[in-house]
Amino acid sequence: MSTLKTPFRYDFVGSFLRPEKLKAAKKAFEEGTITKEELDRVTDECVTEIVAKQKVAGFHAITDGEFRRKFWHLDFMWGFEGVAHEKDGGGVQFNGEMADLEATYLVGKVKAKAHPFVEYFKFLKQFEDEQTVAKYTIPAPAQMYQQMIVPQNIGQTRKFYVTDEELIEDIGKAYQDVIKQFYAAGCCNLQLDDCTWGAIVGDAAKQRYQSLGVDIEEVKARLLKVNNLALENRPEDMVITSHICRGNYHSTFFTSGPYDSVADYVFAQEHVDALLLEYDDERSGGFAPLAKVSPDKKVVLGLITTKKPELEDKDKVIARIHEAAKYIPLDRLCLSPQCGFASCEIGNKLTEEQQWAKLALVKEIAEEVWK
């Protein structure tokens, strides 16, 4: 069992572009020309291959590339009691493109059960060695809470939960159970992917909530509450990090805005060990909010974009790292791409070769900065 802990000086978020072999197998399965067992065999092969590539690239964290899921977040929610989904009706408008998502909603109280993702983790864990550790990525509890209170779901949710507080309580407890399942399977490095904070940054979000008569500070308090409730009673030697995202679908984004308005909550008060933060362009604002990060957290700067194939200027990235170090000590900083390469099956608009070139640049820069 590996004793390595994330994050590393050079790291990555988790998802990778799906190989053509896997895409073809999933299409064949959907068309009914291969069995589930045959699809699983191809998926196992592809996970084995992506882990090998991560090791060859010199990275210490290994993931399954999220190859076993269609969406970075929804598939995980389907693993709880009380949650149902259907193919149509879940589309979300991104910047210039409609994301084709599945409708995911409540049909009962949220409860934990034996979660299929734990079995996926067990397959990944076999590849750990002295130089690598398996990291598993799941959506943050706040993401599940947000999913169940969006306009198209709130009416259905109210059939089972009269108040948001009751919903938060059940989601938090269900996550506690699943976190313990991961730990029992040997997982000591878990990452919570969270678009909820990114969705409420900036003036546009504030104005949107004001128009609905909703106190945005109360929204922030609830997001913090459900995330921290889920982390109560976690194993002491389990590292849990959070990736704060503004949406990533086919190289488009969902929201824009600096971290200033949420830093007092997620940076200062969320009980995670590290924050993986998007900082690849001006949509993320400046580094000043990093001064709010509590001293027990590390920060992974997502300075290399996964949305575009062009490589960043190395010297400019190094300069930005040192700029960030004005607000948080350099020894608490790490480097990664700003997000995954394929948050959903469709993936971003770059090739596999360009994907690995991005990661090589991350490693090269980190080794120069933290000699």
What do the predicted segments below correspond to?
Residues 1-371:
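Domain-level signal for soluble alpha/beta catalytic cores
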